[in-house]
Amino acid sequence: MARILAATAGAPYELEHPELTRHAPFKVVCADPPWPFGDSLPGPGRGAAKHYGVLSLDDIRNHRFVGGEVLDPRRDLVADDAYLFLWRVSAGADIATLTFAEEAYQVARAWGFAPKTEVVLRKQTKNGKRHFGMGWHIRNEHETCVLAVRGKPKPLVQNIRSVIEARVSRRHSAKPEVFYTDIVEKISDGPYVELFARSTRPGWTCLGDEVP
């Protein structure tokens, strides 16, 4: 695993880092960007900015690892046929501005991927009951992940479902084990890279300023 610190556009990933060049090109990219909605939710500890540094939409679109014109094409670290799993915000006061639905698709395209479908994480409480989340119009109980492709990747199996259920982690924005085992690691045998990671995972290259 590589611990390569990168939280802002001014501190990009070291693209020549041996851990990256050794495992590239990556066939799966997972990303849970720090979307800039941190100050929109009232109350202590509710916004993303309370838990980690957020980025502007332009910084996310132009992310150096895979993003647009910023990346030197000679150092492309993503395979010609690859998958992108891009998490977006699924709760907020105004669905047009706080869920970043359209922006997530824009980011995927800016990174060179074509959006195809979505994965839905239906949350449960620690007791296995339905999660009662945030939202002003209705209370959300799910998170959404855009699945996009680059080139023509082929899934390893054909029976992967788009909806998963899992108990909510106490750690902000942490994704459940079932997301990796039942979807990501079934659709491709890697190599895998996770951007904006907050923990490590065996067999993955995990990049982020919170990676231990």
Language-model segments: which ranges?
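Class I S-adenosyl-L-methionine-dependent methyltransferase catalytic core
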Residues: 1-212
